[in-house]
Amino acid sequence: KAVAMDVRKGPLARAEEHVEEVGLSGKIELRLSDGLAKLKAGEADTVVIAGMGGKLTCRILEQGRHVWENWSEGKERLILSPQSEQDEVRHFLEEQGFSILREAMLTDEGKYYIVIEAARGTMRPGREQDYRFGADLIRKKDPVLLAYLEKEEKMTRQVLAGLTENDAQNKKETLEASEAGETAISRRAARINELAAYLALIEETRHEM
């Protein structure tokens, strides 16, 4: 039996309609819940969290630790599909004593989706690109990840080129011996450095694949 939960009444009501339409009312129980709050310890051996950002995914897991803190090594499962900040989710799993068993990357209508399967266990600390893009996907030379990296590289180069090209002119226009002008230039320089570092990480990862 499955338990489906949502913090909002509207989506939960629509989910209930869908469950009834497909004749699964006896197999899926719906609960109004903020994260995992309404799920009891030992009630589920697999927890699926999908359709939200990585920060919120981590918050739900942290606040719902009563569900998983006593799980056995290699037995119960987390299935996570964060829409952003995947690196934070991977760091969280490592810090909380989980091991990533495998990952999958999918694409639909130009959007990319990550699915992470994890269980209790020890995860060896990884490199920055392992947390950013997924060690399992890099190791498998996943073709969807490669396409994603190519897209990210192209977009990052374009943004970086625009910022760098206009940097001298922007400095001239913005810096008027004022604190506000210096702050704007400092922020732009930090953004350029951030993009350059990200581009280098993409290139390094692509070379591995």
Give residue ranges: language-model regions:
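Class I S-adenosyl-L-methionine
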Residues: 37-43, 55-209
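S-adenosyl-L-methionine
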Residues: 5-45
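Glycine-rich, N-terminal phosphate-binding loop of Rossmann-like dinucleotide-binding domains
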Residues: 51-52
